[in-house]
């Protein structure tokens, strides 16, 4: 019985440590990825381009006015890790984060 409990606790500890890896990797991005580290709300499109370079894609948003740029930060678990920068219709940063533009540009009225 005690061996079973020890096994369960060990498995839980390993899963907890693995879950923390994503948060740690993203924290590392705050120091090494210019698009994550230096791009701030209110910056112009030209400032973002100067800091982050050319995005891998840019699309017009459907549920907001403006455009959304996607940057590829690297690979994680065989998939591209993406970071978006959303710009309003005047070309200034309104938001950014670890999503694709499609994930970010969703209908706020849609049921979840």
UniProtKB/Swiss-Prot annotation:
Keywords: Cell inner membrane, Cell membrane, Lipoprotein, Membrane, Palmitate, Signal
Annotated signal peptide: 1-20
One Pfam family named in its UniProt record: BamE
Inducing or repressing factors: By elevated osmotic pressure in the growth medium.
Topology term for the membrane: Lipid-anchor
GO biological process, one term: response to osmotic stress
Top-rank taxon: Bacteria
Localization per record: Cell inner membrane
S-diacylglycerol cysteine-type lipidated residues: 21
Keyword Repressor applies: no
Main localization of the protein described in the UniProt heading: membrane
Membrane is among the record's keywords: yes
Name of the molecule in the record: Osmotically-inducible putative lipoprotein OsmE
């Amino acid at each position: 019985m005690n061996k079973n409990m020890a096994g369960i606790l060990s498995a839980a500890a390993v899963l907890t440590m693995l879950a923390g890896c994503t948060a740690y990797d993203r924290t590392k991005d705050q120091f090494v990825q210019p698009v994550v580290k230096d791009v701030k709300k209110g910056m112009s499109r030209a400032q973002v381009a100067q800091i982050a370079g050319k995005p891998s894609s840019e699309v017009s948003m459907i549920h907001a006015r403006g455009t959304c740029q996607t940057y590829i930060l690297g690979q994680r678990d065989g998939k591209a890790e993406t970071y978006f920068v959303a710009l309003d219709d005047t070309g200034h940063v309104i938001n950014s984060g670890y999503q694709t533009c499609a994930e970010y540009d969703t209908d706020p009225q849609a049921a979840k």
